[in-house]
Each structure stands twice: as C-alpha cells, then as structure tokens.
C-alpha cells in the first residue's frame, strides 16, 4: 500500500475528525433523550399528551442552552489563554 501524501493525510484527518464530531453529537442527543424521557414520560402510550410534550421540549431546550453556555465559556477561557 502506498504511503499517503501530506494532502491526503490532512484530508483523512479532517474526515476522521468530522466523523468523531458526528458520533459525539449523536451520543449527546441520545443522552438528552434518555434523561428527558426518564424525567418527563410517566407511562408510554400511543400518543404523548401536551404536558409530556412540553416537558420534553423544555428539558431538551435547557440542555441545549446549558451546552451552548458551557461551550461559549470554554471558548472564552481558551481565547484568553492564547493571548
């Protein structure tokens, strides 16, 4: 097998990083689903009632807001460290 050139290796690393990000995002979504499901759904049925739908929506929104706040704060810390 031929060795990869620098450009090919960089592209491969970029693709691997993108796949890792997708996997991390998927894992995070499943984690949110599990936590919010356990918090909001008392007994599964054919349909979700409005209270359960609102609870699930609010739960996911809280996790997204928290994740964005933490990410933003971390970026600020990293940026200050690089100055």
Curated annotation (Swiss-Prot):
GO BP: protein transport
Main location group: mitochondrion
Gene3D superfamilies linked to this entry: Mitochondrial import inner membrane translocase subunit tim13 like domains
The protein, known as: Mitochondrial import inner membrane translocase subunit Tim8 B
Domain notes: The twin CX3C motif contains 4 conserved Cys residues that form 2 disulfide bonds in the mitochondrial intermembrane space. However, during the transit of TIMM8B from cytoplasm into mitochondrion, the Cys residues probably coordinate zinc, thereby preventing folding and allowing its transfer across mitochondrial outer membrane.
Oligomeric form and interacting partners: Heterohexamer; possibly composed of 3 copies of TIMM8B and 3 copies of TIMM13, named soluble 70 kDa complex. Associates with the TIM22 complex, whose core is composed of TIMM22.
Keyword tags: Acetylation, Chaperone, Disulfide bond, Membrane, Metal-binding, Mitochondrion, Mitochondrion inner membrane, Protein transport, Translocation, Transport, Zinc
Disulfide bonds, paired cysteine numbers: 36-59, 40-55
Location of N-acetylalanine modifications: 2
Superkingdom of source: Eukaryota
Family, as annotated: Belongs to the small Tim family.
Organism (species): Bos taurus
Described purpose of this protein according to its UniProt entry: Probable mitochondrial intermembrane chaperone that participates in the import and insertion of some multi-pass transmembrane proteins into the mitochondrial inner membrane. Also required for the transfer of beta-barrel precursors from the TOM complex to the sorting and assembly machinery (SAM complex) of the outer membrane. Acts as a chaperone-like protein that protects the hydrophobic precursors from aggregation and guide them through the mitochondrial intermembrane space.
One GO MF term: metal ion binding
Subcellular localization, as worded in the UniProt entry: Mitochondrion inner membrane
Residue numbers covered by motif Twin CX3C motif: 36-59
Cellular-component GO terms for this entry: mitochondrial inner membrane
Bilayer topology annotation: Peripheral membrane protein
InterPro entries: Tim10-like (IPR004217), Tim10-like_dom_sf (IPR035427)
Pfam families in UniProt: zf-Tim10_DDP (PF02953)
């Amino acid at each position: 097998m031929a060795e990869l050139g620098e450009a090919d290796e960089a592209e491969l690393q970029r693709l691997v990083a993108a796949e890792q990000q997708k996997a991390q995002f998927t894992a995070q979504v499943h984690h949110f689903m599990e936590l919010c499901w356990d918090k909001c759904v008392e007994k599964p049925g054919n349909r979700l009632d409005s209270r359960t739908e609102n609870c699930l929506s609010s739960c996911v929104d809280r996790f997204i807001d928290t994740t964005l706040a933490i990410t933003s704060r971390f970026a600020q810390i990293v940026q200050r460290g690089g100055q």
